[in-house]
């Protein structure tokens, strides 16, 4: 397991040319690390949380690399719960790499998902919310985005906690009925406890079913176009995608290998396959 006391860093934006690129650092001492390479060192070191500071970023040898905007987040008021600083620079891959290489002299590159792992370990989110972060990033349709966002906001966590509270309360009532059965005390109604147990089981089953719905939202509903050769499977495939993805000719047997594409239908992710004709 990674050492959570280490400073970690990673680009937050995709590789390639863009207007802006962002590099995030997290961990005790990350603000001081960046300050050593920043034109307004004292201003940065004394900066409060949730503050923006503009200035120049310098290499280890003191050579200016780029003008940057720093976003400061003091613990525990950050994504990871630790001190966090984000460097916004111009989105030239060469500039990003030079800044990153300078930083990496004093810290290490974050592993995939490590910022979210630290947020989980520091109590900034629970496991359900941590999973929702990845679901929201990977969502390919509107409904998948909405479901992931609700989970990230803690809707599933609150639902699970309420269910757990009901189970705990029912367990206490059962234990009370068992431990004091031989004493002349008012005990919980057994029929009421049984009905509560049945209702809890029903609720748990409903929750389990939503898991299957969530899987379909994440992975997409799979649709396979099959049929005899030259009946229009590839034409339908292209029409659904609204692009000429498959070759269409009057001659049968044009499609030899299956084609796979993702699309959104009414906000739901769909994985559609175009296949060779059945003979």
Where are the predicted features?
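Residue-identity detector for threonine
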Residues: 13, 61, 80, 102, ...
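Conserved G1/Walker A P-loop phosphate-binding module
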Residues: 17-25, 37-39, 173-279
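Long, non-coiled-coil amphipathic alpha-helical linker/lever segments
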Residues: 124-203, 207
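A glycine-rich (often HGG/GG-containing) alpha/beta subdomain
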Residues: 1-146, 150, 154
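Detector for Asparagine
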Residues: 3, 51, 92-97, 101, ...
């Amino acid at each position: 397991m990674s050492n959570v006391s280490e400073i970690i860093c990673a680009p937050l934006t995709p590789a390639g040319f863009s207007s802006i690129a962002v590099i995030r650092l997290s961990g005790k001492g990350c603000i001081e690390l960046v300050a050593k390479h920043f034109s307004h060192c004292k201003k940065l070191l004394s900066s409060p949380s949730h503050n923006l500071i503009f200035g120049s970023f310098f290499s280890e040898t003191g050579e200016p690399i780029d003008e940057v905007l720093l976003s400061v987040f003091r613990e525990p008021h950050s994504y990871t719960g630790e001190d966090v600083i984000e460097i916004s620079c111009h989105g030239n891959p060469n500039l990003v790499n030079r800044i990153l290489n300078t930083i990496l002299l004093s810290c290490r590159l974050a592993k995939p998902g490590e910022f979210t792992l630290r947020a989980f370990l520091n109590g900034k989110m629970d496991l359900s919310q941590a999973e929702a972060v990845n679901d929201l990033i990977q969502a390919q349709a509107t409904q998948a985005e909405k479901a992931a966002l609700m989970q990230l906001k803690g809707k599933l966590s609150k639902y699970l906690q309420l269910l757990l509270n009901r189970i705990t309360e029912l367990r206490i009532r059962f234990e009370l009925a068992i431990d004091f059965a031989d004493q002349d005390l008012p005990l919980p109604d057994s029929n009421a406890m049984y009905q509560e147990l049945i209702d809890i089981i029903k609720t748990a089953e409903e929750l389990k079913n939503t898991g299957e719905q969530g899987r379909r939202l994440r992975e997409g509903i799979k649709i396979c176009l099959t049929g005899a050769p030259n009946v229009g499977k590839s034409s339908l495939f292209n029409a659904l995608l609204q692009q000429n993805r498959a070759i269409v000719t009057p001659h049968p047997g044009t499609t030899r290998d299956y084609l796979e594409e993702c699309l959104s239908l009414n906000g739901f992710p769909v994985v559609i396959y175009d296949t060779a004709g059945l003979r």
